[in-house]
C-alpha cells in the first residue's frame, strides 16, 4: 500500500492534529517543513473547494507525491458568505485576528440576522490531477462583542448554541469534537484505508476524464 503523504502546511499544530486522526494506519505523514524551500501555491480561488484543491495539486506536482490541503473560514449569512475565503485577510493582508474581528463587528452592526458557519474543505490530490474532497461545517451565531480567551481567529465572536458558549470559551478538546475541521478529519479517518488504496491506484496514472469516487460514503465528489 502507498504509505507516504505530505500535509500542505508548515503549521506543526495541524500536523500533530492530523497524525492523531490517522495514528492507526501504516502511513508516514510529512509536512512542507520537511522539504525545505518550495514555491508557494497561489490560492486565488473564489471558494474553499477551489483553494484546497489548488494547494493540494500544487504541492503534489512539486513533490511528486500525494498531498493533502485544507481551506477554511467563516461564512456569515447576512454578509452573503463573507469573510469566506478571505477570512484570514478580511481586514487586510497583514491583519491580525483582532483586526478581523473588529471589522466583522463593524460590518454586522445593527444586523439582526447573526447566522454564520465555520466551513472546512480538505482536498487530497495526486500529481496527475485526480482528487478526493471532504467538507464539513459548524453552525452558530455572531455575537456583538467578543467572549473568551481560548482559540483563535473569530472564535471569540462565534457562539455555539449546544454548548451555550463561544468557541473561545471552550477547551480545544471540546472544540475539536464539533468544529468544522474536527468533523472533516473524523470523516476522513473513518475511511482512510479506502483513501490509501485509492491513492495507490491513482498516484502514477494519467488523469481520467471523471474519476470514480462512488465508493466513498462521505466524499462530497461522489454525490
Write out the residue ranges for each language-model feature.
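Anionic-ligand binding patches
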Residues: 2-6, 12-221
Amino acid at each position: 500500500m502507498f504509505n507516504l503523504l505530505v500535509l500542505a502546511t508548515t503549521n506543526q499544530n495541524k500536523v500533530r492534529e492530523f497524525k492523531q486522526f490517522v495514528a492507526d494506519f501504516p502511513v508516514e505523514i510529512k509536512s512542507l517543513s520537511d522539504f525545505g524551500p518550495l514555491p508557494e501555491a497561489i490560492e486565488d480561488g473564489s471558494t474553499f473547494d477551489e483553494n484546497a484543491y489548488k494547494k493540494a495539486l500544487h504541492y503534489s506536482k512539486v513533490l511528486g507525491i500525494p498531498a493533502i490541503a485544507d481551506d477554511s473560514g467563516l461564512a456569515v449569512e447576512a454578509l452573503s458568505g463573507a469573510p469566506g475565503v478571505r477570512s484570514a485577510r478580511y481586514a487586510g493582508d497583514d491583519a491580525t485576528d483582532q483586526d478581523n474581528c473588529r471589522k466583522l463587528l463593524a460590518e454586522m452592526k445593527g444586523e439582526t440576522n447573526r447566522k454564520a458557519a465555520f466551513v472546512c474543505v480538505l482536498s487530497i490530490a495526486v500529481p496527475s490531477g485526480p482528487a478526493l474532497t471532504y467538507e464539513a461545517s459548524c453552525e452558530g451565531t455572531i455575537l456583538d462583542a467578543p467572549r473568551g480567551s481560548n482559540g483563535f481567529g473569530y472564535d471569540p465572536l462565534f457562539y455555539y448554541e449546544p454548548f451555550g458558549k463561544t468557541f473561545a470559551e471552550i477547551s480545544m478538546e471540546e472544540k475539536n469534537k464539533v468544529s468544522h475541521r474536527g468533523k472533516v478529519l473524523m470523516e476522513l479517518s473513518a475511511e482512510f484505508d479506502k483513501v490509501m488504496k485509492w491513492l495507490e491506484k491513482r498516484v502514477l496514472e494519467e488523469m481520467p476524464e471523471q474519476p470514480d469516487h462512488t465508493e466513498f460514503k462521505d466524499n462530497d465528489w461522489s454525490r
